[in-house]
Design a protein with these regions (language model features):
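Terminal RNA-binding accessory module
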Residues: 389-482
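Contiguous mid-protein beta-loop-alpha structural module that forms a pocket-lining wall or clamp
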Residues: 354, 361, 370-371
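Short flexible coil/turn linkers enriched for glycine and charged/polar residues
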Residues: 187-190, 200-202, 299, 309, ...
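Conserved, mostly hydrophobic/aromatic
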Residues: 204, 224, 241, 277, ...
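Conserved SAM/AdoMet-binding glycine-rich loop
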Residues: 119-121, 128-130, 233-356, 367
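Glycine-centered loop/turn positions within well-structured domains
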Residues: 152, 202, 247, 283, ...
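Radical SAM enzyme [4Fe-4S]-AdoMet core and its adjacent flexible, acidic
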Residues: 54, 250-271, 318-321, 381-412
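Proteins enriched for Cys/Gly/acidic motifs involved in redox and nucleic-acid/cofactor modification
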Residues: 1-249, 288, 303, 325-336, ...
């Protein structure tokens, strides 16, 4: 990718049919159009990408930014001033859609004042036909609409918009194609997300993701290794391997490979210091993976293992394919193999039919596992999922009471678990200057906890040894070891 001379691409010829060569052609063509528009208005064109949702969306946004910068746009953090505004949407919760509609209405007024403005919508929300129909009818000023399966065609879609001067819509219901060797602008120079697979086959009854992200597709391991080697050569010391369920990696490859085997290959990459991954589904967390984690020198001592509920009855209704007992056995195995592992989780309160007894099972699993932290959610009915049609929706006041009780329990345990590291020394990857005190820097330990300590900008991206002086509940104050 870095060796492509886009100015040398002959635009008088037809676009190639193979990927990613076809997108290189359209990047060159888009550069021409953007340059002409900038000359016409007498200034650089600007863009603002807003990301809704989780880490895979953030990784997709880095690709959007990479293309926009390569074709000549300059980043503008204030969308009010940008010439090209893109919303990379998330649709896990229904209110996320409402947020996008609200902000779109405001953008429409801005576009009337800026005739050069483009508005693009992509991501999971665009995979819903009802959403696209609503945008076509009520938000006709939108220029680009595309989904999750063809984000690699971004440059081609921009060219189509320049040439047609009409709304461009390109939504694929599904795909088996993976095109990754394209521009990307990383948020951090020292760490990066790496997609290892796309889609999900689990169909949890409350979740829309399999319907908008498609079925599981694993990347070729050689391509993953090549990408990480390139990142390390560019200064990256930590990678986060991304997938809806990384534990099921490799099942659809011509030569099947397990996630544990992939981790062993990544471990061999010289210069790579740390490996993280998410998300892991408890039903697929194998003994092989636990063994690899136990013997690794690079895999971080942190595992995000979403439990969702402690009730086996509710887990069955959720279509999670494990019981409370199975989950606790997985936790026992991982703790036995990696005693200093940090465990975090996701928990949903108020799933349809949840009784007080079910909720007590959830509190019990929180007390038994003693998570370092937990993301707690009130169940949100999601149109298009089986759970949305279930009877016995739990009254709001009951859900709110349970949520408050769970949060109190989680926070108390988290503070106790966090404090056990006080007085120890830990290796820390320095990530930033502290937001509240510029005399401090903020770093992340292997177990994913943050520590703030005296330092300066020159330390960012380096792994240093820090003494943890004081636990502050969910983070530490420390000092650099001499």
């Amino acid at each position: 990718m870095n060796n492509i001379d886009f100015d040398a691409i002959d635009l008088t010829k037809e676009a190639p049919v193979t990927e990613p060569e076809r997108q290189y052609y359209y990047i060159a063509k888009a550069r021409k159009y953007v340059s002409e528009k900038a000359q016409e208005i007498g200034r650089n064109l600007t863009f603002c990408v807003t990301t809704f949702g989780y880490q895979m969306n953030a990784r997709d946004s880095e690709k959007l930014v990479g293309v926009l910068e390569l074709i000549g746009y300059k980043e503008e953090p204030d969308e009010e001033k940008a010439d090209f505004v893109i919303y990379n949407t998330c649709t896990v919760r229904e209110n996320a859609n409402l947020r996008v509609y609200g902000r779109l209405g405001q953008l429409g007024a801005k576009k009337k004042k800026n005739p050069h403005m483009f508005i693009g919508l992509c991501g999971c929300m665009m995979q819903e036909p009802t959403v696209v129909e609503k945008i076509k009818k009520s938000y006709r000023f939108v220029d680009l609409i595309f989904g999750t399966h063809n984000i690699y065609k971004f440059a081609e879609l921009i060219v189509t918009r320049f040439e047609s001067e009409r709304m461009v819509i390109d939504i694929w219901k599904d795909t088996d194609k993976i095109v990754e060797d394209l521009p990307s602008e990383r948020k951090f120079s020292f760490k990066s997300g790496v997609n290892i697979m796309f889609g999900c086959n689990n169909f949890c009854s409350y979740c829309i993701v399999p319907y908008v992200r498609g079925r599981e597709r694993s990347r070729n391991p050689k391509d993953i290794i090549r990408e990480i080697e390139g990142l390390v050569a560019d200064g990256v010391v930590e990678v986060m391997l991304l997938g809806q369920n990384v534990n099921s990696y490799g099942k659809n490859l011509e030569e099947p490979m397990t996630f544990a085997q992939l981790l062993q290959e990544i471990e061999k990459i010289e210069g790579l210091e740390r490996i993280r991954f998410m998300t892991s589904h408890p039903k697929d967390l194998s003994d092989e993976l636990i063994d690899v984690m136990a013997h690794s020198k690079k895999i971080c001592k942190h595992l995000h293992l979403p439990v969702q509920s402690g009730s086996s009855r509710i887990l069955q209704k959720m279509n999670r394919h494990y019981t409370k007992e199975h989950y606790l056995e997985v936790v026992r195995k991982i703790r036995e193999a990696v005693p200093d592992i940090s465990l975090t989780t996701d928990i949903i309160v108020g799933f349809p039919g949840e009784t007080e007894e079910d909720f007590q099972d959830t509190l019990d699993i929180v007390r038994q596992v003693r998570y370092d932290s937990a993301f707690t959610f009130i169940y949100s009915k999601r149109t298009g999922t089986p759970a949305a049609a279930m009877e016995d929706q739990v009254p709001d006041d009951v859900v709110k009471d349970r949520f408050d009780r769970l949060l109190k329990e989680v926070q108390q345990i988290s503070a106790e678990v966090c404090s056990v590291h006080q007085g120890t020394t830990q290796d820390v990857l320095v990530e930033s200057v502290n937001d509240h005190d510029p005399s401090l820097v903020t770093g992340r330990m292997s177990n994913n906890l943050l520590v703030h300590f005296p330092g300066d900008e020159s330390m960012i991206g380096k792994i240093v040894t820090v003494y943890l002086k004081e636990a502050k509940g969910f983070y530490y104050m420390g000092e650099l070891c001499k």
